[in-house]
Amino acid sequence: LAIVKGDLTPPAGTITAPLSRKEGSIIERTVDFDHGEEAITHYKLVKKENGHSLVSLQLETGRTHQIRIHMKYLGYPLIGDYLYNPDMEHITRQALHSYHMEFPHPITGQKMTFTAPLPSDMSAIISL
């Protein structure tokens, strides 16, 4: 889950924008259709409130800063993202949270499922 700035439209979709390291930086990444590596993110609006949107995100690829860059690319940057949206008005960290995770157990193969409630600093901005 992520909280982004703005009222997300359309409410669901897939972002297919390749990513690469930003020229002159060892940290920042950017959308780069000429030289970037494939990056795919599926998103779905969960809730809009007070000029922010709570978004569920699912990655098909796992590029560095993928969620942060893809949401900024759509025009809805993560709040609290000091690198790509330096606005710390509502939260002092990236408003990004791993709410639900599933993967096979490495030995038994049994599906393991984990969930974690939205942290209080994020739920103070948008409640689930």
Regions picked out by a protein language model, each given a short descriptive name:
Residues 1-128:
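RNA pseudouridine synthases
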